[in-house]
Amino acid sequence: VVWTPIGAYPKKFSGSFDGKGHTIRNLCVDYETAAQGERVYLGLFGCVEGTKEQHAVIRALQVEGSVQAASGFSVYTGAIGGIVGNAEYAELSGLVSRVAVSADENVGKAAGLGGLGGVLVNCTLTNCGNEGDVSGVKNLGGVCYELYSGTMTGCYNTGSVTGTGTY
């Protein structure tokens, strides 16, 4: 079964999710863009957005599986991660991603790919890890591709990160 991300753009997830230490196995996000210029946000959660006063929360969860994106044309923008594609004002804690994250050259040039999270803005990551492999053209990272105005404490990456592009 192919998974549709929780909080698919533009309907972002803004609540609290406590995995209570459980493991989600065989996650399968196999996405092919449907329209040129489409925004791509993929993972167990596609888009997560809290506020400065009330952060969204995802905690105590392990995820295993794969997230892959392909397109016959360049996408506008996007973020792809094993657990979270894009997040703003979120607290992520006790998360482990064992998800293989990949994108073809058309998606990979525009999207940020990370093992646990793609693009994270004003987020706090605590005791999180990525053990899955990340592959694409460029814009790649282990735990996440980009953490902007946030903090990361006690996090690790053991997955490989492989880029095939040049600047």
Question: How should each PLM-predicted stretch be described?
Answer:
Residues 1-167:
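Surface-exposed repetitive/solenoidal architectures
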